[in-house]
Amino acid sequence: CLFNDILDLSEMESGTLEFVREKVNLYHACLEEYDRHRLKVNKGVILILDDVDEELCVMGDRMRIMQVLMNLLSNAAKFTPTGEIHFGYQLRGNIVQFYVKDTGIGIPANRVAKIFERFGKINNFAQGTGLGLTVSRMLVERMGGRIWVRSGEGIGTTFFFTLPLG
């Protein structure tokens, strides 16, 4: 929602956005996002929550982690007319690496570097505000992680983000 994105952006920039630090079971958070998105994908698209460690937890803000996942899954659904969207996470040392991988249209090479900027859209026809990835980047960074993308036009896109365990 445009209003929520603008509000979150404003609060992050002013330093007033509050984060709750709690133990978050990542499997339950991902399963909730799976349930939210599985009926929203286009006909001919399969949403898959990959095999993950069902016991893995991080100390973080559950709502903000889910907000990032929701933004990434919504974008994947928007730009995947047919095919698959996989998502999940893996433990890598003392960090957790999340991913959302689609077989969609991909991001043109000249747009990849700007995708996390405000109002960064992959094309002029894309629906949405162009703020979701900016907000996601800021949320991930405020939680001590980082976010990046790999994409090939016509072959799909994979977004990654990391969060520290503790």
Which residue stretches match the model-derived regions?
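A conserved beta-strand-to-alpha-helix junction within the catalytic ATP-binding
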Residues: 20-35, 66, 97
